[in-house]
Amino acid sequence: MEHYGILVSLLLATVLPQGSPFKIEVVEYEDKVFVNCNTSIRHLDGSVERWLTKNKSLILGKGILDPRGMYMCNGTEELAKEVSTVQVYYRMCQNCVELDSATLAGVIITDLIATLLLALGVYCFAGHETGRLSGAVDTQVLLKNEQLYQPLRDRDDAQYSRLGGNWPRNKRS
């Protein structure tokens, strides 16, 4: 008999509905997030865009704007002390930027300004070198005589064999 009592209590525990007489639902419809409760809902903390249907439903806002908050569903008249809470935390993207026409125009204008400043800097730096003579003057200083190339001595076929071998050097002490 004792086993039947345990079996009946287990059967009743599984068959009878367990849980509270009210429920909180977080629903995403189109691009907005809703919090619904079959009794009255109370906003504890966070974002609320608009209340609907006599404090039973509220719109938190667009899902992409990361709505979040703490919401409590109150009990019925029979179970006034029972409450159920839910914490909503949406995190759609961490570093997202909404790309509208103003943002795109700002990026393009900033890119053009940066490119123009870079071109101006290169022009100012490379265009006006001070303290240097022109290339033609450097060539004239390097070539003292009229001859462009010196002939090799003794016409030896070995490459670089006698090139500058016994020439006098200017040694400074």
UniProtKB/Swiss-Prot annotation:
Subunit structure: The TCR-CD3 complex is composed of a CD3D/CD3E and a CD3G/CD3E heterodimers that preferentially associate with TCRalpha and TCRbeta, respectively, to form TCRalpha/CD3E/CD3G and TCRbeta/CD3G/CD3E trimers. In turn, the hexamer interacts with CD3Z homodimer to form the TCR-CD3 complex. Alternatively, TCRalpha and TCRbeta can be replaced by TCRgamma and TCRdelta. Interacts with coreceptors CD4 and CD8.
BP-aspect Gene Ontology terms: adaptive immune response; cell surface receptor signaling pathway; positive thymic T cell selection
TM segment ranges: 107-127
Keywords of this entry: Adaptive immunity, Cell membrane, Disulfide bond, Glycoprotein, Immunity, Membrane, Phosphoprotein, Receptor, Signal, Transmembrane, Transmembrane helix
Residues carrying sugar: N38, N55, N74
Topology feature Cytoplasmic, residues: 128-173
Cellular compartments per GO CC: alpha-beta T cell receptor complex; external side of plasma membrane; plasma membrane; T cell receptor complex
N-terminal signal peptide: 1-21
Matches recorded under PANTHER family: T-CELL SURFACE GLYCOPROTEIN CD3 DELTA CHAIN, T-CELL SURFACE GLYCOPROTEIN CD3 GAMMA CHAIN / DELTA CHAIN
Post-translational modification: Phosphorylated on Tyr residues after T-cell receptor triggering by LCK in association with CD4/CD8.
Tissue-wise expression: CD3D is mostly present on T-lymphocytes with its TCR-CD3 partners. Present also in fetal NK-cells.
Domain of life: Eukaryota
Naturally occurring in which organism (per UniProt): Rattus norvegicus (Rat)
Glycoprotein as UniProt keyword: yes
PROSITE patterns: ITAM_1
Annotated ITAM domain residues: 138-166
Name listed for the protein in its UniProt record: T-cell surface glycoprotein CD3 delta chain
